[in-house]
């Protein structure tokens, strides 16, 4: 299962979803989908922009967890 760790990364920085939306220019609804892991697909440009703004690597934002 692919996981998006946006909620953890924002929490570590004490940022809101609105903060990230403003700083990236990504629609708040899209940020919310990523935050709540509702996105069935991700836009790689969005992931790149989020990593740039958060100062993180893609591997810190997205990971694969094996179902047990």
Show which residues each predicted segment covers:
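A short, Lys/Arg-rich alpha-helix, primarily the initiator
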Residues: 1-15
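Residue-level detection of the helix-turn-helix DNA-binding "recognition helix"
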Residues: 11, 25, 36, 66
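DNA major-groove recognition helix of helix-turn-helix/homeodomain DNA-binding modules
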Residues: 45-60
């Amino acid at each position: 299962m692919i996981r998006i760790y946006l909620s953890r990364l924002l929490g570590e920085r004490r940022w809101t979803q609105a903060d990230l939306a403003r700083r990236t220019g990504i629609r708040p609804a899209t940020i919310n989908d990523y935050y709540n892991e509702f996105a069935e697909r991700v836009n790689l440009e969005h992931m790149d922009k989020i990593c740039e703004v958060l100062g993180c690597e893609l591997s810190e934002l997205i990971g694969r967890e094996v179902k047990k």
